[in-house]
């Protein structure tokens, strides 16, 4: 046989998965009673004797024979006392007959094949089955269940161990001697404890089915329906006595094994032990096991199939036992449960032997078809198997299966899934106690409430070990050949039996009473002497515990208090406590905050972190009305549910949706009254008053009678707390009732234009029943409502009326009081979405509401508290795809057959009010695509074309002339030509310049090659539009640099420097040099102002004002009036054909100092000197200030100063020189102060300075010379010269042939008598006066004068430093400054003498005139230049070698001009922006003839000898124009009433679209009024057949105000809905008129009407149908009828 674990090694525990039942101790066939016990060693043999209460010996006969036969009057509750010696200890048994073991009508019957063999009804059964306690003076005693019918046989507890006792088979009782008995400890089953085997196979039978308890719950409900008088459950857990009326069946193998009549005694002994286990206090309930019927099967029953297959055996037995059960609980033989004892080796789900010991239905007690169990006989431990299976019938599950009572260590319990190797007493665990208590409190054990009708027969009981010695116990367990194994272990701990050659144990101790020594036996696992049995101790209740913590923090939780039956604990067969065991009360009644999950949901969520079949789930509760107090949950998004707990936490509502307060308490649904007491039965009256009588109930009713309405209309308000609500239509109508909350957008019923089905709906905390029969609607609810509910009517047709009423609670005495009105602002419903697809807008208006009256005028509410109307976006279903077509572009041609207009066509979907999304074209394939091109302007004929002739010859042979040609309209199309497209008929032609003979002047004496009148009259000769070159951004904005300056006009922005024609400038300059050698009579005066006009001498203009008289400033400079640009601006170049400004890199800044800096050697950073803004006086070409005169109003403004003509070494000096006898040209010169010395000739006035806020310009006077010079750090000082021209002369001078005499210049600051002038302030242009009043050289010099030169570096206090007092002028003039770097511009240049002889020469001696000396002239040198301004030189010397000897007046000309043609070339400006960015345009640029030296403008004929003039026009923008891209129109800003749509307009490539064809970006939309047609429901057909008409109401309604429009034309933008339609078109079936039985009016009256001929009237014919109908031919007359009746 399979082995078991080694001794004292615990068997592994299995996690229970079974619900029906498990095995405890499998047995093996054992010997029959009376067999030999040889081979058994270490048996504790005891010799019990019967004693009295004091311990005195009474008899060796353990149960008196006389008592069995005669003394039937002996008290059944008389105790029996026994003593025995067990392991040297004296044990005393105090036993009492088990009065509840056998029912008064107990029947023991034997069944044979074919029927009942015999039945024995015992009216007075021997009371030899005893219950009580064993005591030891030192050891702790315990319960004892002993049968004393034939010796002592049973079980008892000692020292927390179980012991069996039974008589010793080998030593039968002898008269006068004590009968030997065997005592041994309870052991684990042999097959689980076979020596040397460590495995413990499972002994569980049937797997758990979670729906078993649900089935039981449903069965209980059906039983309650069948038995309505069943009392309801009580609020408290009450301990009540229960009697389990039991049928015990022993199968044929049992009877054969134990034999007759011992088998009956054996079975009763087992059941007596079972009854003792159910009397253990650990079970927590008083339960009596009572046998009403014992059936012994000698043969197999035909309908009872007992096999190894436990499941089939249980099924067969349950069916069989039900068939033999007596109907009616009052029958003496009716049993509550049935127990089968069999010697078959059971196996769950298989028909072969295995380890299963028993099987039972879980929670099957009191169910006739399920209250049954089967148990495998294993000897006396069979009692524990029976108790285990009965525990399953009471709904107890295995310890550790779904609970936390898994056995720990060696402490087993009765409901443990397996037995452990331990002899400790088996008791009920805490979980078993809770299971059986809940089973009974549920009312599932009602069949156990009836006790047996008669007294129970007393019969004696002795410990089983007295009746069955150890050898007998081995034979009972292992068969007839088994014997006790000696010296293996303490028999009171473990019973070891020999099976073949091996000792086996079932880990059970020998039963109590088993002999273990001299006068000792096993008791409760110890070998003790037989002791005295104490008095029975009934149990007593302890005090109530403190109330537990509330099971919930809100929402009505539960607290409990309990007491235990521990003061004292029942002992020695004492009675268990009866009465209230646990009480409950409610707590934390306040409602939980809104939004919290339900209490069941919280309990389900506790399992979210636990794996279920290897996965984590989010559990949500499942409603289970059958078992409302079980926790059933399902994973979210799954479709299966699982019972996660047998019972929910106390305080969980039984039902989630029902309006019930019932709570689950201790796994049972308890009723909660309105007073919040459990099972109080308190009820509310009809208005919700608990224990009320209805006196405070007030019924409110009303009728809504408005006949017409639009959409949802408020009917009335049901307040919170309303009950008995009834709402119904007065008559049938096609309208619909609706319910909404105070939130206008929250509807409970029929909201959102959606009609719901009939049924129950949760509304405001209660249930409304919605019923619609035909067109008649009503709503009912018991209430109460937890919030106000608005009744609304959805109009479809005229309203016949809506009646509503409800009941509300009002305090008594308050009926006559009118509550004050309460006004408040509320939001109305949201309007319909402004769009039917995509995203739109909804609005919610605010209205004033009175609590009772409903909506009222806004004047009643507080205007300051009025909330703003709300607006929100609304989203409808996506808009369908559609084609969008843009606007037609401008026609490609304004006339002719080729005109074509295009537009963009896109597939789009409207997303929102102002948003569209583009789709692929296939999305719009279901719609026809709009055309993208259309012909245009093809009906318009094009204008005629222009025809042109050939150009004529130029009108001049040189210079500029004109050319002409004929231009005619061809009239080829019949339409006049377009004047705007007419070609030019006259153009300007330019030929080479007209040249004058060299050395001669023009007709007017001008050296320019043309007359001054010609120059003056050519308005386009010098471009007036040229502006000064802008200064860099880092420089301050320059001041004005105009030529015409007026005093006291500092605000005027005067034009900057402009350019003059270098040709005239250069020629005049050369004439000036000719004046140096020719006398006044030889060379005429030249105009040095740079105007190009010859100015008459002062004496020839008598009208000119005196030079000494000031002229007031009366008007701005003439230059600005003539179109010359004013102050510099960032864009001073207007487009003009043939003209272009100098390139930006060549533009001259407006800062005056820049014009004086060297161009070639000056670094780029020169403009960053930070020069201040100032006004620069108009300076003529020769350096003179030239005020504007009437004659010079059209003078060309001066551009660059003449210093820029100098070579680099001399460009830092500007010398303006004029002779003393010359007058400055112009007018308006101010009166100058007189000379400081009276010996000097008077000064000539120079001109006026430009007035500024701080006059920073001083005036200089010299001996006949006035010079303007800016003096600034790094600037240039003035140079005074009378005889030597300093402008452009250095480039004309050849190296000197003869040394010049040395001349010295003394600084004026060191000379006495120098006048002082105001010192310029910081930041201004410093002008230094150099006056050489007494330092003029003798006039006999050759024309070299003194040129005092100021310092370039400022001295202290801002005054310029001076040079040394005496500096040779000639060496300074003919020397080259050494510029080492641009940084040296602030220092005085180091001069390098060109002629050392000149530097060394001293002052000249007095002149000694040599007679006959004459001038000698050398050969002319080559021209200094090939073009432009040049000169030739020749040496001139006096024949005597001393120039002083020759007359200066006769000196030949040493230099003269050459090559008068300027170096000219065409200069092209930048191309202008194309006139059209696409489609063919033109670009222009300015082409000018300029001097190649400094790009000064020249007249065009200067460039004609050179290359041809570059083109000034060119085509551009030839690429074709692209179409403008336009997005889809955005949603209209208004749904109606006129809005605006916008769209994006852009060019795919910037600049490649025709701007003139740019589409509009906005357009008006939704111009129709805000109205729509509103239709009502169709009315009833006017006729059910034969052609009828249905009509409906059609109105034009303003969607903004909701009011109908008087003028239906306002809805003209929508199609008129049909207001009628045909119906009932099927043909009517012919209907026979109803048969007239009798007249409705009296017979006499009808006869009178008939006689009067009124039967022709339909009403009369209907009322008197019998009288008015013609008599039938076959009908007897009334007279005949009367005769017949007679």
Curated annotation (Swiss-Prot):
UniProt xrefs under PROSITE patterns: ADAM_MEPRO, PLAC, TSP1, ZINC_PROTEASE
Entry note: cofactor: Binds 1 zinc ion per subunit.
Gene Ontology CC annotations of this record: cell surface; endoplasmic reticulum lumen; extracellular matrix; extracellular region
A single MF term (Gene Ontology): metalloendopeptidase activity
Domain Disintegrin: 462-537
Expression triggers: Up-regulated in articular cartilage and synovium from arthritis patients.
Region annotation Disordered: where it falls in the sequence: 1024-1043, 1080-1257, 1344-1396, 1666-1686
Domain PLAC, chain residue ranges per copy: 1632-1672
Domain Peptidase M12B: 242-452
Disulphide bond pairs: 318-372, 347-354, 366-447, 405-431, 474-497, 485-503, 492-522, 516-527, 550-587, 554-592, 565-577
Polar residues bias spans: 1182-1205
Keywords for this protein: Cleavage on pair of basic residues, Disulfide bond, Extracellular matrix, Glycoprotein, Hydrolase, Metal-binding, Metalloprotease, Protease, Proteoglycan, Repeat, Secreted, Signal, Zinc, Zymogen
Cofactor section: Zn(2+)
Tissue expression notes: Expressed in heart, brain, placenta, lung, liver, skeletal muscle, kidney and pancreas. Detected in meniscus, bone, tendon, cartilage, synovium, fat and ligaments.
Biased composition (Basic and acidic residues): 1210-1226
Cleavable signal peptide: 1-27
Domain commentary: The spacer domain and the TSP type-1 domains are important for a tight interaction with the extracellular matrix.
Protein name: A disintegrin and metalloproteinase with thrombospondin motifs 7
Species this chain originates from: Homo sapiens
